[in-house]
Curated annotation (Swiss-Prot):
DNA-binding feature ranges: 51-75, 103-126
Domain HTH myb-type, first and last residues per copy: 23-79, 80-130
Protein name: Transcription factor MYB78
Name of the gene this protein is made from: MYB78
Species, as recorded: Arabidopsis thaliana
Classification via Gene3D superfamilies: Homeodomain-like (1.10.10.60)
Length: 307
């Protein structure tokens, strides 16, 4: 082996040693507030780039992949946090019937929501409920239950929430030296904190407002519109129309299934204490025995060719 060959081998071994050394020094586990601040400040100054290089330059003992996921899923200013709203639930169910598990495509129509968040919602809520019912989430039976029962019930809840919000003020005023923090943002850092420092940097000393996990402000206005995706799938900002799932003429609910709903006389949104929870995921608090009965009845109607 010549001198050149030995030199290349030594360099390769050194690179491998450095890589192993860096991996041993990589930090695992939850991100700290200080790490979040360092990542946000670095991206504010230099922008996004190659994440492995960014992690080294920002002096973060994290992998490039960890930095990328932390930024995209939690720290980006436009990321929306908090429970999936009723309107978002309806849209997810609607889009999934068209596109299946194409989470990135679905996320395009839910501003501020990441594909990972939507996927987790589907798996922890919809798939879990289908499993409890011993029903395949991809079966026609389960799809019909969503289309003819749960989605109309969601519409009812959205309309009820809209009516209940009429008496509430639709706006919040603050003095010029106050910041309004959306209660959906539960990140360590809120992008509004950037405004509190004329240099655009965040430090532990000036981030007391930013790291507040919950705001005292609550959403005062609930949209009265229930949106349905338009037919043009190529639109970046899709044309949205207001659906009417309760309209029998549309074929979504026929007379037999409406009678079946009336006979059930169920309150689909009560929890075990008989109280309606004040969070949006209460939609899935449905009694299993009642679901089984409806699934069986619906399957009989479907088998008889009434749909």
């Amino acid at each position: 082996m010549g001198d050149k060959g030995r030199s290349l081998k030594i360099n390769k071994n050194m690179e491998e040693f450095t890589k192993v050394e860096e991996e041993m020094d990589v930090r695992r586990g939850p991100w700290t507030v200080e790490e979040d601040l360092e990542l946000i400040n670095y991206i504010a100054s230099h922008g996004e780039g190659r994440w492995n290089s960014l992690a080294r330059c920002a002096e973060l003992k994290r992998t490039g992949k960890s930095c990328r996921l932390r930024w995209l899923n939690y720290l980006r200013p436009d990321v929306r946090r908090g429970n999936i709203t009723l309107e978002e639930q309806l849209l997810i169910l609607e889009l999934h019937t068209r596109w299946g598990n194409r989470w990135s495509k679905i996320a395009q129509y839910l501003p501020g929501r990441t594909d990972n968040e939507i996927k987790n919602y589907w798996r922890t809520r919809v798939q879990k409920h289908a499993k409890q019912l011993k029903c395949d989430v991809n079966s026609q039976q389960f799809k019909d239950t969503m289309k003819y029962l749960w989605m109309p019930r969601l519409v009812e809840r959205i309309q009820a929430a809209s009516i209940g919000s009429v008496s509430m003020s639709s706006c919040v005023t603050t003095s010029s030296d106050q910041f309004v923090i959306n209660n959906n943002n539960t990140n360590n850092v809120d992008n509004l904190a950037l405004m509190s420092n004329p240099n655009g940097y965040i430090t532990p000393d000036n981030s007391s407002v930013a790291v507040s996990p919950v705001s005292d402000l609550t959403e005062c206005q609930v949209s009265s519109e229930v949106w349905k995706i338009g037919q043009d799938e190529n639109l970046v900002d899709p044309k949205m129309t207001s659906p009417n799932y309760m309209d029998n003429s549309s074929g979504l609910l026929n007379g037999d299934f409406t009678k079946m709903q009336d006979q059930s006389d169920l309150n689909w949104f009560e929890n075990i204490n008989g109280m309606v929870p004040n969070y949006s995921d209460s939609f899935w608090n449905i009694g299993n025995d009642e679901d089984f009965w409806l699934l069986q009845q619906h399957q009989q109607v479907h088998d008889n060719g009434s749909f």
